[in-house]
Amino acid sequence: MTEKLIFELGSPGRQGVLFPANDVPEIPPHELLPRDLIREQEVPLPEVSEGDAVRHFVRLSRMNFGVDVGFYPLGSCTMKYNPKVAEDAAGLSGFANIHPYQPDEISQGALQLMYETQQDLAEITGMDAFTLQPAAGAQGELTGMLIIKAYLESKGETGRNKVIVPDSAHGTNPATAALCGFKVVEVKSDQRGGVDLAALKQLLGPDVAALMLTNPSTLGLFEDNITEIAALVHQAGGLLYYDGANLNAIMGYARPGDMGFDVVHLNLHKTFGTPHGGGGPGSGPVGVKAELAPFLPKPVIIQREGNYLPDYHRPQSIGRVKAFFANFSVIVKAYTYLRSLGGKGLKEVSEHAVLNANYLMKQLSDHFRVPYQRTCMHEFVVSPPEDMKEQGIKTLDIAKRLLDYGYHPPTVYFPLIVEEALMFEPTETESKETLDEFAHNLIKVLAEARENPDKLRNAPYTTPIRRLDEVMAARKPLVGWFPE
């Protein structure tokens, strides 16, 4: 049953709250506010009772799907279970009730937590300094590329106006580079899914500012030639940027800084167990090697004479990228995750993430086309079997049918270089039984497609909204309600 909009509930004049009669003189709004700030018409608020409003939003909440509801194998998103102890930590009054304008002297606990988080992330990634300011991965990317741009300008290398990105890159990579004023150049992948070294050599030159790379890649493959790639980029005078979206695969085993990366951004809301989805809040810290540290956003939390304080005296800084001290509660949750697991636990996280991905890929390899015959890392990409084309079944149909089995679908049609791609990331927190059941049902969906293709083409059947007009949603997204 489709849920009505809250504006379609209730009736004119119905109130959710009855206020007592006003016992003070009313003052006309124009005597208190400039006329250009006063509404000329009443706001079209819904007129519903408190009970109807509560029921409406509870019904909506029961339609949500998240990691606390079921298996969520959305590739390149690391939808792992988020431990609830982190929520308890973030809710402690010392963290929840502080204000960013408090004096440093009475904010030492919060400042210490941020400082130690910076240090922990630097150790995990092999970087020398970190900022916690960026509010999400994309803003972290932007911050990292602005740091690279400022660094090159400080050296007088303003002619470096190109950024190289692989054809398997996250879409945010070229978008970020373009937003920073760089020209984006694509480098092709080789037959094994890695960066084509010959193609890279052709692109490198005195006009290249950086190569943006994810390792493991969005294909779920480790870049075997990473040290050679780093050497080539550095020999050409460029910098190597690490998109940390896939760090969950290598913690305790490999560090971007040791591979030759100069700048990294991370996603605390992916790798480090803080909830994400629905627009946030997130956290996208950025780490750099020592020579780029002066350009980090200010303030950076430092320790001096036993005290923790924000350092604003950074004349080469790119400036603030976020008000106050970032999404602080997310940092508290990530700190709790880091300290709960420790170094040994983080290493086991990556072990299990890689094990689960390879186990699931093996389960599906006889039923789907696997484009790269390699051991995967934390995620993998497959394509539907050839006979699905004969049935007129597309990746989207398979994904939609999975909804009826109670799963969130995998990422579809990405990376773009894989035909009809389905990208799975099971994460480390799923059991063997969950993976077995999921594989069984996914294979069952293929059998349904062969027996009755229309069953998939018309799926899903159990969701409140079945199939959106994808073109209209992309070109004319109406996400708000407006009175007729």
Swiss-Prot record:
Keyword Transmembrane: no
UniProt lineage: Bacteria, Bacillati, Bacillota, Clostridia, Eubacteriales
Subunit structure: The glycine cleavage system is composed of four proteins: P, T, L and H. In this organism, the P 'protein' is a heterodimer of two subunits.
Pfam families xref list: Aminotran_5, GcvP2_C
Name of this protein: Probable glycine dehydrogenase (decarboxylating) subunit 2
An example Gene Ontology CC term for this record: cytosol
Keyword entries, A-Z: Oxidoreductase, Pyridoxal phosphate
Coiled-coil segments on the chain, per record: none
Gene from which this protein is expressed: gcvPB
Family named by the database record: Belongs to the GcvP family. C-terminal subunit subfamily.
